[in-house]
A protein has these predicted regions:
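Membrane-embedded alpha-helical bundles that constitute the cytochrome b-like, heme-associated redox core
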Residues: 1-228
């Protein structure tokens, strides 16, 4: 009998909506990067992935307010001392239960960079065949600046964050922290009793309603594109 394992508390950390959001975002971001680099007819799918990412971002912002305990922004750890403690391999147990200090900063960075990338994409124009759905609502100067950011700065920032995220997962796996597994089944074995995220049918129904509203809102934004 593994006495250490018998003293661990299996706790629901990531509710199903958060897990589905995470993996849907992974697929959508990879799709964005790949189709954006291919160009040409693949840009049709680039726009579709962009629409999906916009809906997912809106969902995450709302779910960060009403979602499971560890998915809420109020439980993110962004204190500088917590960041320093994690870098030194220290910190309280609760700092590694949900998103750690560095993990919290990574989520915030991802959301901000993706918002900037999607936002700039909405008003970008490749000057060949494809233009964002909102380019007709802003000046040509804004379109030019947004296009430059979207194709150069934003894309590199996004790819850089993705690579850092992958390296962080590898590092945590080496340290014995199964981050990927927890984001699949939702649970973590904890040495101390910690609050569990609610993940019942009520929370999942609420998430479904929020997601439908976000999908509708994203579709509406993209429907503003002029028709010729």
């Amino acid at each position: 009998v593994n006495l250490y394992a018998s003293h661990l508390h299996r706790t629901r950390i990531w509710d199903l909506p958060t897990r589905l959001f995470h993996w849907a975002l992974v697929v959508s971001v990879v799709g964005l990067v790949v189709t954006g680099n291919i160009g040409g007819s693949a840009m049709i799918w680039h726009f579709r992935f962009g629409q999906a990412v916009l809906a997912l971002l809106m969902f995450r912002l709302l779910w960060g307010l009403v979602g499971g305990h560890w998915s809420r922004f109020s439980n993110f750890i962004v204190h500088p001392m917590a960041v320093l403690s994690e870098l030194r391999g220290r910190g309280r147990p609760e700092w590694h239960t949900g998103h750690s200090a560095l993990g919290s900063l990574a989520v915030i960075a991802f959301v901000l960079v993706l918002l900037a990338q999607v936002g700039s994409g909405l008003v970008s124009d490749d000057a060949i065949a494809f233009a964002g759905p909102l380019t007709h609502l802003v000046s040509s100067a804004i379109v030019s600046q947004a296009s430059a950011y979207h194709k150069e700065v934003g894309k590199l920032l996004l790819i850089g964050l993705v690579l850092l995220h992958v390296l962080a997962i590898i590092w945590h796996t080496f340290k014995g922290r199964a981050l990927v597994g927890a984001m699949v089944h939702g649970d973590k074995p904890l040495e101390q009793v910690m609050p569990a995220s609610r993940d019942g049918w009520r929370q999942r129904l609420l998430a479904a309603i929020v997601m439908v509203l976000c999908v509708a809102a994203s579709a509406w934004v993209f429907s503003l594109a002029p028709t010729f």
